[in-house]
Amino acid sequence: MGWVNRLFNREGNTPEYQELKFTLHRKLLDRINLEALSSMAGERVRTEIRSAVARLVDEEKTPLSLVEKDRVIEEILDEVFGLGPLEPLLQDPTVSDILVTTPKLVYVERGGKLYRTSVEFKDDAHLLRIIEKIVSRVGRRVDESSPLVDARLPDGSRVNAAIPPVAVDGPLLSIRRFGRYALKGEDLVAKLALTEGMLDLLKACVKARLNILICGGTGSGKTTLLNALSSYIPEDERIVTIEDAAELRLQQTHVARMETRPANVEGTGAIHIRQLVINALRMRPDRIIVGEVRAEEALDMLQAMNTGHDGSLTTIHANTPRDGLGRLEVMVGMANANMGLRSIRQQVASAVNLFVQVARFSDGSRRVTHITEVVGMEQDIITLQDVFLFEKTGITESGRVLGRFRATGIRPRFCERLKASGISLPPQLFQTVVEIN
């Protein structure tokens, strides 16, 4: 049975069906020899368990059609080998997020929009068991003393779970999935996330080793754009990546990846992003890429950008480039309370060359809304100038967002730096307007 039918067919998810499935699952665990199965090859194990479940179904003498029998067998196999009811969602390549709010309320994001599915867990205990299965696979734990967990599945998907007492109404689970292949800049142009001219500009900035900070809200496409831009880093450079949960997929050969680590049961042993940024400086990087700056590590990232690690990239949660500046100032202040505001702004202005703002719109589309140059300091204020903007002009009856990508006519000051790197951009690039109809 295809995952589409299993995902959206609400018939058959009756309490009686769920009870039958769990009765069979319990009996299966009592009957099979797990030790003997562990020595078998994967496909043979599935065959043995499939046969055992089929015998149990027959013994129950429950009137099931062949389709229903196949379905219950597949779902029990999902319980044994996979993540139970989540398996059909994980097999669906169009699903980007899986959001479990209650055992009976499971949503997916597809194409930037949320849809309720027919997927259900039996109860809180069933959902909690799947959460524990997920986190145990990656060496994490979740319990009353540690009720929050961030983890990464083997396929790179990012998992966040919360259980009582912090989750008031029962366990919560969110899975952020990533496509099988990382999107390239050209793919983003095809999806109308930006124009070809905007991509040419960003590509030139990466090659000329400008420091770029990508801003946006949750789910706006920051990591997707970061992945795409990183593909333009020359192959002969050494790149060090630092993330909370490794999700960047760089295509270059010489990439050193590091990931934070939470505290152990005793509350010790945590490794934070700031420690990894400091450590990265000792690893002879040509460029440092931080998945996201959230706190004190912002100071170390800026200092790295200012001390010979040009061409570094990172992301930050912010709604506009100016908001991104404000957040950076706060983060640097957290790292060094003795640093005056003017000194902080001088650090930021000398380190960051470019802000790229991304946003998700009501129709699910994601677009680059600003490409903004950091010009420098005027008295105590950091000056910015927009090079490209996306302007929303309306919404169709079907809900599609209309607008235009518009060059502001300003030729950025960093064009001289691009020229010094052997990169020239046509003057008309900074005069273009592209309508999204």
Describe the residue ranges of each PLM region.
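N-terminal anchoring/assembly modules that precede and organize ATP-driven motor systems
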Residues: M1-Y115
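Active-site phosphate-binding and catalytic loops of NTP-dependent enzymes
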Residues: A36-S39, E59-L66, F81-D92, I134-A151, ...
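P-loop NTP-binding catalytic core
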Residues: D92, V100, L105-A208, P426
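P-loop NTPase switch/communication element
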Residues: G179-A190, N227, S231-I278, G324-L328
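Hydrophobic anchor at the beta1->P-loop junction of P-loop NTPases
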Residues: I214
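Conserved lysine of the Walker
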Residues: K222
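Conserved P-loop NTPase nucleotide-binding/switch module
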Residues: E243-A256, A280-G376
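NTP-binding/hydrolysis catalytic cores, primarily Walker-type P-loop NTPases
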Residues: G364-N437
